[in-house]
Amino acid sequence: MTVHPPVVGHCDELQVALGAFRASAHVTQRWGDRLAAVLGGGGRLLAAGNGGSAAQAQHLTAELVGRYRDDRPPFSAIALHADTSSTTAIANDYGVDEVFARQVRAHGRKGDVLMLLSTSGASANLLSAADAARAAGVRVWALTGRAPNPLMAGSDESLCVEAPSTATVQEIHLVAVHMICAAFDAALERGEHGARAAGSAASTGRAARRERAASTGRAAGAGRAAQRKRR
């Protein structure tokens, strides 16, 4: 079977881009460590993108609310584009450029992190979100395509992928997402962060056990009282 050049060409393009992106491993490490500190301390990650980048942003939040590899407590992470009712209401009432910015003002708190993904680095709604985040004291990270671009300039930190096609940029963004998650989990495993989250989970578990025990005790007491009454 003949494999057409564009097919293997994409693999070649991806291999080159991935090789170049290895030089950014220290940034994904730093972001993962920082995210562990923020989320482990009760903070939140907000994430947004358009189209394929929205899927990558939601992939990141899913890894944090669920898990990346091993079991661990859930952490607060919201993909802003996933709330279709809010997104469409804001677009209808305030315009598309405000769909993420208004949600950042609603959900973001000082010390939180906003992750924005854009292959062009020029999406107006993401630039507005970055402005809203900085005004709220929320740190802005961006995953973009080639530098320079407006989103890179409007972020606190950015990782720009040097690749000729949108598809390859998005694939490298997914690699970056997994690298960040690996660094995040490693920081938790080292015990540097997440003690509050783990402690909260343990406290919740203890409270639930106490409530179950109290309920059992109340039920047993009611049963004994009923038996005495029947006698």
From Swiss-Prot:
Task: Give the required cofactors.
Answer: Zn(2+)
UniProtKB keywords: Carbohydrate metabolism, Cytoplasm, Isomerase, Metal-binding, Zinc
Pfam families per UniProt: SIS_2
Tell me the residue numbers annotated for binding substrate.
50-52, 63, 92-93, 118-120, 123, 170
What's one GO MF term for it? D-sedoheptulose 7-phosphate isomerase activity
- Region spans: Disordered: 197-231
Biological process (GO) annotations held by this record are: carbohydrate metabolic process; D-glycero-D-manno-heptose 7-phosphate biosynthetic process; positive regulation of DNA-templated DNA replication initiation
Q: Which residues form the SIS domain?
A: 35-190
Give the co-factor note.
Answer: Binds 1 zinc ion per subunit.
Q: What pathway is this protein said to act in by its record?
A: Carbohydrate biosynthesis; D-glycero-D-manno-heptose 7-phosphate biosynthesis; D-glycero-alpha-D-manno-heptose 7-phosphate and D-glycero-beta-D-manno-heptose 7-phosphate from sedoheptulose 7-phosphate: step 1/1
Top EC category: isomerase
Q: What InterPro entries does this protein map onto?
A: GmhA/DiaA, Phosphoheptose_Isoase, SIS_dom, SIS_dom_sf, SIS_GmhA/DiaA_subfam
Note the HAMAP family from the entry.
GmhA
| Protein's name in the database | Phosphoheptose isomerase
Please give the organism. Streptomyces coelicolor (strain ATCC BAA-471 / A3(2) / M145)
Its gene is: gmhA
